[in-house]
Amino acid sequence: MKGAGSASFLLTLLSTITRTSAHGYVSNIVINGVSYRGWLPSQDPYSPSPPIGVGWETPNLSNGFVTPEEASTDAIICHKEATPARGHATVAAGDKIYIQWQPIPWPDSHHGPVLDYLAPCNGDCQTVDKNSLEFFKISGVGLIDGSSPPGYWADDELIENGNGWLVQIPADIKPGNYVLRHEIIALHGAGSQNGAQLYPQCFNLKITGSGTAEPAGVPGPELYSPTDPGILINIYQVLTDYVVPGPTPIPQAVEVAQSSSVITATGTPTPV
C-alpha cells in the first residue's frame, strides 16, 4: 500500500510540475531587422529602473498563463496585472513583425493556436485604460495537420521558426497608436474544463501609412468563453477540423508564410 501511495503521489507531483513549469513570454519584437525590447518578467520587476520597452509590463508570475475561467476578466487582455508599456515601436502598415518567444524552445508538448489582434488606443497607448481596448483579429492559425494525434499546430510551426512568429500589419489600417495583442493557447490539458493555458502578450505600436480601415473590435474579456470548442477540446484524437477561438479575422487580415528574422540593429522604444 505504501508503494501504491508513493506512486500516486509521484503522479500527482509530475502532473503539477507539468502544469506549472511550462511558461513563456516574448523577449523582443523585430521590425525590418530592428529589435525592440519587450518586458522580461524574470528580471524587470526586481529592477529599480527597468529599461523602457514596447512590451506591456507584468509582475513576475512565474511566466505563467491565464486560465479559461479568467477569460472574462481583465487578466485576459494583456496578461495578469498588466500595465501599458512605457514605449512604443513604429511600424508601417503592410510591414511584418517577428515576435520572439522565450524559453527556447517553446515546450513541444504545448500544442495549440497562435493568434494576433490589434486595438486602437485612441490616444497614447502608454496611458491607455486596458479595459477600453477593443480588439480585432489580424491573424489566427490553429490546427495545420490533425491526421496523427496530437497533431501539428501553429505553435509547432513557431518552434521550427526559431521560437518566433511572423505577423503582418494589414496594409490599409488607419494610422495611429495601437496595441498588438499576440497569444499562444496551449491545449495539452484542454480536454478537461479549465485545462487550456492562455499566454497573451501585448506591445505598443505606432502604425504609419495612409490607410482608412477602422475595423470594429471587442473588449478583451469578450474574446473567449471557457467552453468555446477551440478551448475545451481533446487534442489526443484524430481531428479533421478545429475552430480557432475568438472572432473571425478581419477581411484585411493576411496570413503570411512563416520565416525567422535577422536582427541587424537594436531599436530604442519611443516614450510618450
Swiss-Prot record:
Required cofactor names: Cu(2+)
Reaction(s) this enzyme catalyzes, per UniProt: [(1->4)-beta-D-glucosyl]n+m + reduced acceptor + O2 = 4-dehydro-beta-D-glucosyl-[(1->4)-beta-D-glucosyl]n-1 + [(1->4)-beta-D-glucosyl]m + acceptor + H2O
Co-factor remark: Binds 1 copper ion per subunit.
Enzyme Commission number(s) of this protein: 1.14.99.56
This protein's record includes keyword Transferase: no
Name of the top EC class for this enzyme: oxidoreductase
Protein name: AA9 family lytic polysaccharide monooxygenase G
Organism: Emericella nidulans (strain FGSC A4 / ATCC 38163 / CBS 112.46 / NRRL 194 / M139)
